[in-house]
């Protein structure tokens, strides 16, 4: 076998490989002889089929198999001989395998960069810490009480905030009734904002039996595109008004929600508030860590990974209206530059974390994958069981989660064992403002 190195610089390794025809022919002859002992052909006893007959029937497929095997073995030899740390499948080009010439081909191999892990102990980050107070918990209790109000008392008084109103309504645009603009026996809590902005407010002050004209404008982002941004008039018939019975928040109230006492329900809400904030805090901290890492990394990355990441980014932005709006006023050149920079950041950090996980011998446990699946499920409220079933029945989908799961594990290990974390306490209101500001900053990161 002859090997001529054509290129060995950066992350590209190209070589021209040739194998004498005699070696190929020898392999073909051995394979055909083996087949004479195995194949069954009408008119010949088992093991007694002439080579010429076997060659006529199987010669082409045997030759193709031998050539493919030779190519794979040659490429593997080159990789091992030159100690190449490859990514992806080697590309075979300029293949010459005519019967009167040697087997020749060019192999192009993309390499992973050599990664030096920076001194992570020099990195310091603030770690937000939520301090849940009694006011936060009482707000949750009041929300729960509001959701479980019992609207049994019919009212003849004027409609006010908090009342439950039963209505019939017909919607008109330019005095023409529009499709899906009719409501029958529809119940709405005034002030819940369940209807188009401004609709509920215009019912306040009316009474049972009244007919009310409600004028509204559909939001620009309304789900029915043919109605978005349009003015509409609804003729509303007030059929019934009910007020809520006062809800007493006590031990009996708590028992309706699988708690033995009100104190136990308060403890449950305290933990719930902490857990809900923890995921958002971890996401922000992860991005802040990546900001620090980005400044420390300057190694080249494989072009194939870069292109793959750019395509993922573009596809994700096309499906996300908020992300798309951030780029709508940018020129084509600016958008390309943005994607290039962001893709480079992501690929570099991804490669670093993979190398770090390898250096620390971090292994995925079943619980690590469960956490990632739980995170995925939380993105689809009300459809959690569907998400769990999807991953349960799709092993290949589980494979796709292993990369992100290992990355998360590496990040948590860095938080726990490497960088300096300075705890910074926040009230719930302060934390919400901080997280909102941070989320806007890292929307596309």
Curated annotation (Swiss-Prot):
Where does it localize? Cytoplasm
Cite the Pfam families for this sequence. Answer: FKBP_C (PF00254), Trigger_C (PF05698), Trigger_N (PF05697)
- What's the name of its gene? tig
Main localization is: cytoplasm
Q: Which Gene3D superfamilies match?
A: 3.10.50.40, Trigger factor ribosome-binding domain, Trigger factor, C-terminal domain
**Per its database record, what is this protein's job?**
Involved in protein export. Acts as a chaperone by maintaining the newly synthesized protein in an open conformation. Functions as a peptidyl-prolyl cis-trans isomerase.
The PPIase FKBP-type domain covers 162-247
Record-linked SUPFAM superfamilies: FKBP-like (SSF54534), Triger factor/SurA peptide-binding domain-like (SSF109998), Trigger factor ribosome-binding domain (SSF102735)
Q: Report what the protein is called.
A: Trigger factor
Q: Which InterPro entries match?
A: PPIase_dom_sf, PPIase_FKBP_dom, Trig_fac, Trigger_fac_C, Trigger_fac_C_sf, Trigger_fac_ribosome-bd_bac, Trigger_fac_ribosome-bd_sf, Trigger_fact/SurA_dom_sf
Give its E.C. classification number. Answer: 5.2.1.8
| Entry GO terms, CC | cytoplasm
The organism's lineage is: Bacteria, Pseudomonadati, Pseudomonadota, Alphaproteobacteria, Rickettsiales
